[in-house]
Regions:
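Binding-site signature for planar aromatic cofactors or substrates
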Residues: 1-132
Length: 132
């Protein structure tokens, strides 16, 4: 799957994916997210609340977002593992307000009010959902 195909799948709605992070001790967390957007072939942005994922990303900027689209059989499933590294993490300013406004439009004011920070990631690697 090339990056354009990954971007099409990544940005399809509705879809949910998981974001895996680890703190500086290597303790792993995985959480379900609907807000991440792949804005080009090298960049993912998202809004986040004040939670374990946010704390982990402050300590360790690396993460993996897994996106999956079910098929008729497991062999028909589409998906990718998108390896990420934090570039910007902002709790105010234009980027933050832009992300928050996008979440308000997509999920409502209540969801937007829960956003504590906006994150910009660079994509460091893309791998298939399953490797044989």
């Amino acid at each position: 799957m090339n990056r354009q195909e990954v971007m099409d799948l990544f940005n399809k709605r509705p879809r949910i994916g998981t974001l895996s992070t680890a703190n500086k001790k290597g303790e792993v967390n995985v959480a379900v997210f609907g807000s991440p957007q792949m804005i080009d072939e090298n960049t993912v942005v998202m809004g986040i609340g004040r939670n374990r994922t946010f704390r982990n990303l402050q300590e360790n900027p690396k993460a993996v977002f897994v996106v999956v689209e079910p098929g008729k059989t497991v062999m028909d499933w589409k998906g990718a593992r998108v390896y990420l590294e934090v570039v910007d993490l902002e709790s105010g300013g234009g980027f933050f307000e832009e992300i928050k406004a996008g979440i308000a439009k997509a999920a409502g004011k209540q969801a937007a009010d829960m956003i504590h920070a906006a994150i910009r990631f660079k994509i460091t690697e893309v791998r298939p959902i399953v490797e044989f």
